[in-house]
Amino acid sequence: HFHLVKLGNDAVTKVRRRVTWDLRDRRGRKLDPEWANRRRLLRARERLSQKSFAKMWNDIMAEDHSGQILSAWIAKEELRTLLSTVRVGGDPHLTRHRLHRFLAWCIDSQIPELLTLAGTVDTWWPEINSFVRTGITNGRTEGYNRLVKQVKRVGCGFRNRDNSARRIRFHCTRKQRAATQTSC
């Protein structure tokens, strides 16, 4: 889920930067509306107040006559809507409808960054669909892998494999140990 939303946010950022360069032949500056609203573009729609949403929308509409930045933002929100299907139990009909709506938006826009995003989602759709249907992620595994790498990095090369394995198990079970200590 996180990685897909990050891909959507990265596409919005790439479109914003490219459009700014096309409009001004330079990077964005503080007074440029698309640069000033860059954080709002990355924020979820439900986390924007009506006032900040209206400001973002109107400022960008006034400057970007091609509408590419807002098209990218809408595509990102469509992707988030598709991923939110997991909250309603992964209804297959609703999932197919939202996937079609997302892919159609990206393809109809003919924006290169959105075409790349749509291609990535289409390529990884079987894996994404299994997440939407089941709601199961590999987030816990990735978290444990991060802990193992961190322990190895801090350990500066253990000489004893048993001590290395013991330290990794110690760090990976910290939450469970804290829960059992307080319940006794």
Language-model segments: which ranges?
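Acidic/histidine-rich catalytic cores and adjacent linkers
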Residues: 5-9, 14, 22-184
